[in-house]
Amino acid sequence: MEGQRWLPLEANPEVTNQFLKQLGLHPNWQFVDVYGMEPELLSMVPRPVCAVLLLFPITEKYEVFRTEEEEKIKSQGQDVTSSVYFMKQTISNACGTIGLIHAIANNKDKMHFESGSALKKFLEESVAMSPEERARHLENYDAIRVTHETSAHEGQTEAPSIDEKVDLHFIALVHVDGHLYELDGRKPFPINHGKTSDETLLEDAIEVCKKFMERDPDELRFNAIALSAA
C-alpha cells in the first residue's frame, strides 16, 4: 500500500515563514533568500544564520552519488553527535516540512515558541524517538499536515496535482556541536560535512550546496534559503 503523499512546498521565504508562524514559532528568526553563492551576495544575508535549506533536483547523477556516499560511510564510519535531531521521510513530498523541522529542532534553544505551539509540542513529544519513530509521528500529526497543505497552496506558482511526481527535494544544513550536518530524510543517517561554527555556518553550508551544483552542471533548479536572526 502506498504511503501518504503531500503537496510540495516552495523554497520561498514568505511561504516558509508563514508556515512556521502558523505552527507557533515566534518570528525572531526568519527565512531569507540566498541570491547567489558568491561572497558579495552572501554578504547580503542577515547574520547570524542558524540553518540553510537547499532545494535541488534528484537526477540520475545524484542518485548514483547518494548510493556511493552511503556505502562509503557505512564502510568507513563517521562521527555524528547524539545531539543531532534527525528524522526519516516516509511521506511523499514532505521534504520541505521535514527540512523546516530539522532546521528548527537543531536550533531549538535559539527559538521562541508561542504558547500552545504545535511545532514545539511535536518536538517535545519526539525528542526521545528514533528517526523512524519521528517519521511515523509526523504521519499522524494533523496540525502539521494541515498547515503544510495550506502553505503548499500559498506559493507563487500553482501547486501541482497531489499525484504528480516531483523530482525536487529539500535538505537542511545545520551546525550542531561544532560540526556541519546535512539532514535528508531520504538518507539513512545525517552526513557530517566537517567543522563549522555559528559565525561560518552560511559560508560552510554554501560550500556543500556548490558541490550539489557541480555534480549536475546542466541543472539550473537549485535554490537556497537561510534561517537568519530577524
From Swiss-Prot:
User: EC number(s) in its UniProt entry?
Assistant: 3.4.19.12
Family annotation (Pfam families)? Peptidase_C12
Look up the record and give one Gene Ontology term from the biological process aspect.
eating behavior
Q: Could you name the active-site residues?
A: 95, 169
Task: Tell me where in or outside the cell this protein is found.
Answer: Cytoplasm
Region of interest (Interaction with ubiquitin), residue spans = 8-13, 219-224
Keyword annotations of the record: Cytoplasm, Hydrolase, Phosphoprotein, Protease, Thiol protease, Ubl conjugation pathway
Indicate where this protein is primarily found.
cytoplasm
Site feature Transition state stabilizer, where:
89
Please give the activity regulation comment for this entry.
Answer: Inhibited by monoubiquitin and diubiquitin.
User: Where exactly is the site Important for enzyme activity?
Assistant: 184
Q: Which GO terms describe its molecular function?
A: cysteine-type deubiquitinase activity; deubiquitinase activity; peptidase activity; ubiquitin binding
Q: Which CDD domains match?
A: Peptidase_C12_UCH_L1_L3
The reaction(s) catalysed by this protein are: Thiol-dependent hydrolysis of ester, thioester, amide, peptide and isopeptide bonds formed by the C-terminal Gly of ubiquitin (a 76-residue protein attached to proteins as an intracellular targeting signal)
Indicate whether Metal-binding appears among the record's keywords.
no
Domain UCH catalytic, first and last residues per copy:
5-229
Instruction: Identify residues that carry Phosphoserine.
Output: 130
Q: Which GO terms describe its cellular component?
A: cytoplasm
Q: Where are the residues of the annotated region Interaction with ubiquitin. Crossover loop which restricts access of large ubiquitin adducts to the active site?
A: 152-159
Biological role stated in the UniProt entry = Deubiquitinating enzyme (DUB) that controls levels of cellular ubiquitin through processing of ubiquitin precursors and ubiquitinated proteins. Thiol protease that recognizes and hydrolyzes a peptide bond at the C-terminal glycine of either ubiquitin or NEDD8. Has a 10-fold preference for Arg and Lys at position P3, and exhibits a preference towards 'Lys-48'-linked ubiquitin chains. Deubiquitinates ENAC in apical compartments, thereby regulating apical membrane recycling.
Concerning PANTHER family, the annotation shows:
UBIQUITIN CARBOXYL-TERMINAL HYDROLASE (PTHR10589), UBIQUITIN CARBOXYL-TERMINAL HYDROLASE ISOZYME L3 (PTHR10589:SF24)
> What do we know about how this protein assembles, alone or with others?
Preferentially binds diubiquitin; the interaction does not hydrolyze diubiquitin but, in vitro, inhibits the hydrolyzing activity on other substrates.
Q: Tell me which family the UniProt entry assigns to this protein.
A: Belongs to the peptidase C12 family.
Protein name per Swiss-Prot or TrEMBL: Ubiquitin carboxyl-terminal hydrolase isozyme L3
